[in-house]
Swiss-Prot record:
Disulfide bonds: none annotated. The keyword Nucleotide-binding does not apply. It catalyses: 7-aminomethyl-7-carbaguanosine(34) in tRNA + S-adenosyl-L-methionine = epoxyqueuosine(34) in tRNA + adenine + L-methionine + 2 H(+). Monomer. GO terms for cellular component: cytoplasm. Belongs to the QueA family. Keywords: Cytoplasm, Queuosine biosynthesis, S-adenosyl-L-methionine, Transferase. It comes from the Bacteria. This is S-adenosylmethionine:tRNA ribosyltransferase-isomerase. InterPro entries: QueA, QueA_dom1, QueA_dom2, QueA_sf. The gene is queA.
Length: 357
């Protein structure tokens, strides 16, 4: 398959710069095999599910992973910006840095040195240990563990997606907006955005309707924003992300499905993790590892019956995933409908509920 097969025209004004308020007021496009599209709202979700169904939530928490700093080398100083990608050890992170060409192994970087909010921790300094492709580097920080986490939290900014960050600056409101209400496990540098639509009230209404929720963790990396650069999509390589499905959760998911319940993943992150944890037999097993699963049309889904997901960008791996899940022709038609009827796209945009083709 070619990258051009997943292209479509998306007006710039369709990209949402702020989320709906309240969260569950966002629109929801229902896509069912062989049925007309239905224009609803996220708050209608309890009426679209039935008792015994399970919503799988990604409980990762976004950290303020964008850091500005200065690279020093033999007296020269260059302003740089890092977006942390994945933690490798207590003091080691991989990151995407700009300008990557101005960095080399051994360089020292001081982050937030003009920002005195975290002075009590000392300087947030790091050494470039390795340099990869596309601006990816490995940083070894002088601080480690909780001290490093606190310094990043004080000095970092929320890592808004590029299409939003190019149009406005991150602000204090994003610290709340770009976080799900059920986030618990620190580690993501991008939000699992389908989950942003949930409110405590909506979760309570779902529970009253007999819909259960299960929590898994996938720490979303900055690689989720990277464009596909290969014309043949089979040549694209995903960045690995760490995830966990514990044994008790796996058992409950298997039992619910055996009893006739449908497994509905809230977001592509939950879906990719669940598919990584499931065997060819469809049984979900405990999983605690990295996954670089790349789902494209032709993939045979094992563990998920439904998917709630926002509207994705042209030629993105996530648009390829929804085409695999609900059918390429169906999703191209659904996206045409969404654009023509004013749905808002991307991380702060509206949502869809897809049933597997």
């Amino acid at each position: 398959m070619k990258l051009a097969d997943f292209d479509f025209d998306l007006p710039e004004e369709a990209i949402a710069l702020r989320p709906a308020n309240p969260r569950d007021a966002a629109r929801l496009l229902l896509v069912e095999p062989g049925q007309d599209f239905r224009d609803l709202a996220v708050r209608d979700l309890p009426g679209l599910l039935r008792a015994g169904d399970v919503l799988v939530l990604n409980d990762t928490r976004v950290i303020p992973a964008r850091l500005k700093g200065v690279r020093t080398r033999e007296g020269s100083r260059v302003a740089v910006e890092a977006t942390l990608h994945q933690r490798k050890a207590g003091h080691v992170w991989t990151a995407f840095m700009r300008p990557g060409k101005r960095l080399a192994p051994g360089d020292r970087v001081s982050f937030g040195e003009t920002d005195d909010r975290a002075c009590f921790l000392g300087a947030l300094d790091a050494t470039v240990k390795e340099k990869g492709e596309g601006g990816e580097v490995t940083l070894a920080f002088d601080l480690s563990g909780p001290d490093l986490d606190a310094a990043i939290a004080e000095r970092g900014a929320m890592p808004l997606p590029p299409y939003i960050a190019a149009k406005r600056a991150e602000d204090e409101q994003d610290r709340a907006d770009y976080q799900t209400v059920y986030a618990e496990e620190d580690g993501s540098v991008a939000a699992p955005t389908a989950g942003l639509h949930f409110t405590p009230e909506l979760l309570a209404r779902l529970a009253q309707a007999g819909v259960t929720t299960e929590r898994v963790t996938l720490h979303v990396g900055a690689g989720t924003f990277l464009p596909v650069k290969t014309e043949d999509i089979s040549e694209h390589r995903m960045h690995a992300e760490w995830g966990e499905v514990d044994a008790a959760t796996a058992d409950r998911l298997n039992a619910a499905r055996a009893a006739g319940g449908r497994i509905v993943c809230v977001g592509t992150t939950s879906l990719r993790l669940l598919e990584s944890a499931a065997g060819e037999d469809g049984v979900v097993r405990p999983f605690r590892d990295e996954t670089a699963i790349f789902i494209t049309p032709g993939y045979r889904f094992r563990a998920a019956d439904g998917l709630m997901t926002n509207f994705h960008l042209p030629k993105s791996t996530l648009f390829m995933l929804v085409c695999a899940f609900a059918g390429t022709d169906t999703m191209r038609a659904a996206y045409r409908h969404a654009i023509e009827t004013g749905y808002r796209f991307y991380s702060y945009g509206d949502s869809s509920l897809l049933w597997r083709a």
